[in-house]
Each structure stands twice: as structure tokens, then as C-alpha cells.
From Swiss-Prot:
HAMAP family associated with the record: TMP_synthase (MF_00097)
Residues annotated as binding 4-amino-2-methyl-5-(diphosphooxymethyl)pyrimidine: Q37, L38, R39, I40, K41, N69, S108, K137
Name this polypeptide is given: Thiamine-phosphate synthase
Species this chain originates from: Salmonella typhi
Lineage: Bacteria, Pseudomonadati, Pseudomonadota, Gammaproteobacteria, Enterobacterales
Reaction catalysed by this enzyme: 2-[(2R,5Z)-2-carboxy-4-methylthiazol-5(2H)-ylidene]ethyl phosphate + 4-amino-2-methyl-5-(diphosphooxymethyl)pyrimidine + 2 H(+) = thiamine phosphate + CO2 + diphosphate; 2-(2-carboxy-4-methylthiazol-5-yl)ethyl phosphate + 4-amino-2-methyl-5-(diphosphooxymethyl)pyrimidine + 2 H(+) = thiamine phosphate + CO2 + diphosphate; 4-methyl-5-(2-phosphooxyethyl)-thiazole + 4-amino-2-methyl-5-(diphosphooxymethyl)pyrimidine + H(+) = thiamine phosphate + diphosphate
Amino acid sequence: MYQPDFPTVPFRLGLYPVVDSVAWIERLLEAGVRTIQLRIKDKRDEEVEADVIAAIALGRCYDARLFINDYWRLAIKHNAYGVHLGQEDLETTDLKAIQAAGLRLGVSTHDDMEIDIALAAKPSYIALGHVFPTQTKQMPSAPQGLAQLARHIERLADYPTVAIGGISLERAPAVLATGVGSIAVVSAITQAADWRAATAQLLAIAGVGDE
């Protein structure tokens, strides 16, 4: 059985929005979300440090699981709950420093080979994507679909997992039915006509996660 080397997270992280601003972090924590990621791309550390500090403070205020995407040095410096890394970041990141700081680690994967690479790092959770076509970011691979997602879940057994990529309110129940621990969403909330209603409906489906 695979086991994380990094600090553990609940198998069910619940609804897991991925957003690009502190304003969204605050809105969603106020709305009841308890697992969330700040993903700001392609800026220097000094440009995003204030946002990272503010996001981490909000996470603490709401006793939430706040992951910082990519900016691992800032996450360590300001003691975030966790860090999320893409495959391309694994080789250039000091994983031992993240581990020594006591931060949780999530890693993105897109196929079996990348799952193997992620498992070698023994992160706190493994993200599996993209499940469906997505407009949120350019993807180098084809969508996995539900059947492939289910196969990955079967392989990983009790390892905490997060499904991501094109997951809408309508698709969320079928994604969770694969046995995946959590669902990450982006546009299902941020581009919804009524983000509060969308968040409430997704929370009703996915929950807030286990303690």
C-alpha cells in the first residue's frame, strides 16, 4: 500500500476550489469552503508575497486547508498549510525543505507515468486530471474521462486523491462516484452566474472534507 511521507491530509478534502486571488479566497472561506488553493501564475516571488501572506492569514482565521500553488519558498517562509506542485516543478523544488517545514504537499498528475513520479515523492495527496476538457489552462494531454479516473483510484486505493479538470456542478456526482476523495473546481465557481449558489450546491455534493 502506498503511504505519504509528507504530513497527511484527510482522505476527503471535500470541495477544493482553485482560485487566483485573495478576494476569492476570502469569499469562498466565508461561504463555508474549508479546502482551497491560491494559484497565481508567472509572477516573481516578491510580486505575490503580500497575497500569499494574506491568503495564509485567512486560512488560519477559518481553520482551513490553504494550499499555495508553486511558490513553495513563500509557503515555507509564512508557514502555509500546504504546497501544490505541477510535474514540471518537482525537479526544481526542494521537497526536503517543504517536508522539514511540516507543510503538506499535493502533486498534479496526468497519466500513469506521472503518477509513478508523484508516488516517488510520497506527497500528502495526488491530483488526477484533467478529467474533462477544460478552458482554464493549456493542457498537454487528452482528458482522462471517468473510466480512466476510476482505474487510477483503484490503483491508488487509500491514498488521498483529488480530481480536477472541467468538473462542473452537473458532472460532480459522477466524478465522486469513482471513489476519488475530493474534487477541485475552478470555473464551476468563478464563472458561475451565481457563485454563491454554485458553491452551496457543490458543497452539498462534495462536502467540506473530513477533519
